[in-house]
Design a protein with these regions (language model features):
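Membrane-interface "cap" regions at the ends of multi-pass membrane proteins
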Residues: 1-39, 94-95, 199, 235-239
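Flexible loop linkers connecting adjacent transmembrane helices
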Residues: 3-10, 43-48, 71-96, 121, ...
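Juxtamembrane transmembrane-helix boundary signature
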Residues: 31, 58-90, 99-110
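Extracellular/periplasmic helix-exit of transmembrane alpha-helices
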Residues: 65-79, 220-224, 229, 249-278
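Hydrophobic transmembrane alpha-helices that form the core helical bundles
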Residues: 75, 97-128, 135-139, 303-322, ...
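Loop-to-transmembrane helix boundary motifs in multi-pass membrane proteins
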Residues: 94-95, 132-135, 246, 292, ...
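Transmembrane alpha-helical segments of multi-pass small-molecule transport proteins
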Residues: 101, 126-148, 164-169, 327-346, ...
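Hydrophobic alpha-helical segments and their helix-loop junctions in multi-pass secondary transporters
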Residues: 162-189, 204-220, 375-384, 409-418
Length: 419
């Protein structure tokens, strides 16, 4: 039985309205965590420090792409009652569905590696702890949180983490002077300054992550409302869209804040930033110790929260192989979580240069993502799977276009990484 069965109907009022929409908010924010993970931090600070406000539009475009794809995969979970992994097992040929799910699980390990490293880097900034020991502490903290808390508690914790990250960047922005007219132009008027193509491609190609597609289709089922049949599905689809839109806008705001901070400090002083530790160290003389420490704390929260969601996604993917829903008390979900985080931790410990692991991580994600995205679109475009809620032809065309675009960007990034 899914862990989401713990959400009793008595938790929800019978009258549906604005308050119910507010109470529905949650699954999208867990997905947003993957949108503001340490990997995105690195890309955003590189974009802001090298090209000022001119690449803010990339965050806007990537957010629109993410809203469309995440909204679509959430539909799969609501209509079928299955996560992407379960749906692939049920509706795809064995020779196709299961290999894609296994590759998705490998991608979740790669994601966990990057997220754990983010937490470890933050601990090194704050306390001087070595990267391996910081990775061990981050992993241990995440495992304890996952195995000692219900989904509802974890959701509240993640929402709290995202809120604190947002407040941290709001504080940082108060300390700097931003030419808002220039920033607004950068956010909505595309431009590609000379030498910026690699960063543009990196941000656009990395925004959609395989584990988030699996995760969203699972956790959207945590919501129940006092309706049945078609009326229930219609209402949940509307509520889900509000949740996804609201959550992705928050992700857009936080990512934009990173570029704004980098542009107003590093770019304004002609400083190039290539690593997060370098960014934190350079904030001290520019904005003071408080700004640097808050930066590190926000990174730690991002690392922990994104490791939690990557672990949950791994549990969902692995359980789906056995046609089971995610349940943190179920053996297959537990095995998926432990394998994903454990293998990622071992790679960090035994790799001579842990940051080479990030390159390997990006390569694995670039190879796997096209399979997951095309699997998702094929399932949601199938009347056998979705019934009357199958994608419209225009929606299918748009989704396949986005799938091809994201796949092309990731293949291009893979070639660049190999070079």
């Amino acid at each position: 039985m899914s862990i989401f069965k713990e959400l009793k109907r008595s938790d929800h009022p019978r009258v549906l309205g604005a308050i119910d929409i507010f109470k529905y908010i949650g699954p999208g924010l867990l997905v947003t965590v993957g949108f503001i993970d340490p990997g995105n931090w690195a890309s955003n600070f590189a974009a802001g420090s090298d090209f000022g406000y001119s690449l803010l539009w990339v965050v806007t475009l990537s957010t629109i792409m993410l809203i469309i794809l995440q909204h679509n995969v959430a539909h799969l979970g609501i209509v079928t009652g299955l996560c992407l992994s379960e749906a692939a097992v049920k509706y795809s040929p064995k020779w196709l569905g299961r290999p894609i799910i296994v590759s998705g699980f490998l991608a979740s390990i790669s994601t966990s590696l990057a997220e754990i490293l983010g937490g470890a880097i933050a601990l090194q900034m704050l306390f001087g702890i070595s990267i391996p020991n910081g990775a061990l502490l981050t992993t241990a903290a995440v495992l304890i949180m996952l195995f000692t808390n219900s989904y509802k508690r974890m959701e509240k914790a993640i929402i709290g983490f995202v809120s604190m990250i947002g407040l941290a960047f709001l504080y940082e922005l108060i300390l700097v002077d931003i030419p808002w007219e220039t920033a607004l132009k950068g956010a909505f008027i595309p431009s590609v300054p000379q030498g910026s193509l690699m960063i543009v491609m990196s941000v656009l190609g990395a925004v959609v992550m395989p584990h988030n597609l699996f995760l969203h289709s699972e956790i959207v089922q945590s919501r129940e409302i006092y309706l049945k049949g078609e009326e229930r599905i219609k209402k949940m689809l509307k509520y889900e869209f509000v949740d996804t839109l609201f959550s992705m806008i928050i992700g857009w705001a936080i990512n934009s804040a990173m570029i704004l901070l980098a542009a107003s400090t590093f770019f304004a002083h002609g400083e190039h930033v290539s690593e997060l530790a370098q960014a934190q160290a350079m904030l001290t003389p520019l904005l003071g110790n408080n700004a640097a420490n808050i930066f590190a704390i926000a990174l730690l929260l991002a690392g922990i929260s994104s490791t939690i969601t990557s672990g949950m996604a791994a549990g969902s993917i692995f359980a789906g192989l056995f046609n089971e829903a995610y349940n943190v008390k179920d053996a297959h979900s537990i095995i998926g979580i432990v394998l994903s985080l454990g293998i990622a931790l071992l790679v960090i410990f035994f790799l001579g240069d842990p940051f080479k692991g990030l390159i390997v991580s990006k390569m694995v994600l670039s190879i796997q993502l096209p399979f997951t995205v095309f699997l998702q679109v094929s399932l949601t475009s199938s009347k056998r799977v979705m019934g009357r809620y199958v994608n419209r032809k225009s929606t299918t065309i748009l989704l396949y276009f986005l799938a091809a675009l994201v796949s092309g960007l990731n293949i291009w990034l893979l070639i660049e990484l190999i070079k």
